[in-house]
């Protein structure tokens, strides 16, 4: 996913000149590239967790993503462009040492590129087995995954305006599910909420108390794997498993 944002002071001046309100969030936009029709996001399969035990194959995988980035970001902007790779539930289900090996190799690959990295990043290692490249490559928690999804959905739906109310977020991924929403004020318990503060162009704050919960192992792929295992256990592991829940082409 490639995106950019305007200088906040420039955008504020522009909106003032046009007589537009300033009590809005800064505008995010797709990064401009050689082609205005270049997609701002790309998805490839499989996920990072599939490289457990075969980290030598990560370079070719990551380079597919970097090829897309280079097609969108102008070459002269690469040194000012930070890059982050955030893995989700599939990686959370791996053993710590396996996660770390994948993250470190991923870090080696992107450090060869002319992107911007935090000046404090001196080597490939991170603070723990869930981070590398000083946090530019890491495995995010289920709560972070839910929070980021909630932020993205509400931003894209323009639900952060002064008169708007936010929407809830339910995400069933491949290996986990997340739920995030702002509860009613009388249901808010500060110990269970994430405090989100967004800064508008007029320097006012947009604050939200968000409840987030996550269920590792309850994504669509993980749930189906358990379902097939239960079928095989019940039927004695036959070569063909009768499954009334699938369409004919998948039986």
Name the predicted role of every residue range.
Residues 1-19, 155, 162-193:
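Gly/Thr-rich phosphate-binding beta-strand-loop-beta motif of the actin/hexokinase/Hsp70
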Residues 1-122, 191-193:
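Conserved phosphate-binding loops in N-terminal lobes of ATP-dependent enzymes
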Residues 50, 89-93, 144-146, 174, ...:
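Solvent-exposed loop/turn segments at secondary-structure junctions
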Residues 71-79, 157-163, 168:
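Surface-exposed acidic, glycine-flexible loop patches that form ligand/cofactor-binding
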Residues 82-88, 136-142, 168-171:
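Extended hydrophobic secondary-structure segments that form protein cores and membrane-embedded regions
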Residues 115-158, 174-177, 182:
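Active-site neighborhood for divalent-cation/phosphate handling
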Residues 222, 228-247:
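Non-catalytic, alpha-helical, charged scaffold/linker segments
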Residues 249-251:
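Conserved small/polar residues in nucleotide/adenosyl-binding loops
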